[in-house]
A protein has these predicted regions:
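Short, Lys/Arg-enriched N-terminal segments with co-localized hydrophobic residues
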Residues: 1-12
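Bacterial N-terminal signal peptides that target proteins for export
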Residues: 11-20
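C-terminal motif of bacterial Sec signal peptides marking the signal peptidase cleavage site
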Residues: 30-32
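Bacterial signal peptide processing site
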Residues: 34-36
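Structural recognition of alpha-solenoid helical scaffolds
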Residues: 44, 71-78, 150
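Buried hydrophobic core positions in alpha-solenoid tandem helical repeats
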Residues: 48, 78-83
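Structural detector for internal amphipathic alpha-helices that build alpha-solenoid repeat scaffolds
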Residues: 59-71, 93-115
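Compact alpha-helical subdomains of small soluble proteins
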Residues: 99-185
Length: 186
C-alpha cells in the first residue's frame, strides 16, 4: 500500500518526466530537420540564395557535378531581388566556374538570369568584365558599383520586356540587357 506521501512523490516525478520529455521534443523539433533539400526542376530562389550564402548548396546533376538548378523565366523577378546583393559567397556552382576573385551573390544571380535568357551559361563563370577589356585578367572584373549598374540594366531590360515588341519599335538592344553598358560576360 502506498501512503499519500508516496503518491505525491510519484505524481511529482511523473510531472517532472513529462516536462523533461516535452523539452526534449521541443529541442528536437527546432534543431532536428534543418537541412532543406532543393528540387532541381522546381527550385526555390530564396532557399538557393540561403544555401549559397552559407556555403551549403550541393545540388548535383546526373554526372555528379554541382550545378545551378533549373530556373525558368518565371523565376527572374525573384532572382532580380538579389541582383544588388554584393555579399561575397564561398562558391558558386558552375561547370565552367573557376572562382577567380571574389564571388558576389548579385553578380551570380545576374549570371543565372542571363543563363535563362540565352538558354545556356553565358560565360566561364559568374563574372562580368569591361566590354573593351584587353584580356580576361581579374583587373578587368567589374567593381561593386559597376555590378550595381549592371543590375540596373537587367532590371530595366526585364521591365521593358513586359511590353510587346512591335515592328515600329525596333530596338537592337530590346532583348540585350548589357547592350550599350560597357559590360559583358567573362
Amino acid at each position: 500500500l502506498r501512503t499519500p506521501h508516496d503518491v505525491l512523490i510519484l505524481m511529482k516525478m511523473k510531472k517532472t518526466l513529462l516536462m523533461l520529455w516535452m523539452a526534449v521534443c521541443l529541442i528536437v523539433s527546432f534543431t532536428g530537420c534543418t537541412s532543406e533539400e532543393m528540387d532541381y526542376n522546381n527550385p526555390d530562389v530564396t532557399l538557393f540564395v540561403k544555401q549559397l550564402k552559407t556555403g551549403t548548396y550541393k545540388m548535383k546533376n546526373d554526372k555528379g557535378v554541382v550545378e545551378v538548378p533549373h530556373f525558368t523565366e518565371e523565376d527572374i523577378p525573384e532572382l532580380l531581388k538579389y541582383a544588388e546583393d554584393l555579399t561575397i559567397i564561398p562558391s558558386f556552382p558552375s561547370v565552367y566556374n573557376m572562382n577567380n576573385g571574389k564571388i558576389r551573390l548579385g553578380e551570380c544571380m545576374l549570371w543565372v538570369i542571363e543563363s535563362i535568357r540565352q538558354g545556356t551559361p553565358p560565360s566561364l563563370g559568374c563574372k562580368m568584365v569591361l566590354a573593351n577589356a584587353e584580356n580576361y585578367e581579374a583587373i578587368y572584373f567589374l567593381t561593386d558599383e559597376e555590378v550595381l549598374d549592371a543590375a540596373a540594366c537587367y532590371r530595366s531590360w526585364w521591365e521593358e520586356r513586359q511590353y510587346p515588341k512591335t515592328r515600329w519599335t525596333i530596338d537592337p538592344c530590346y532583348d540585350e540587357p548589357l547592350c550599350g553598358s560597357g559590360y559583358r560576360w567573362w
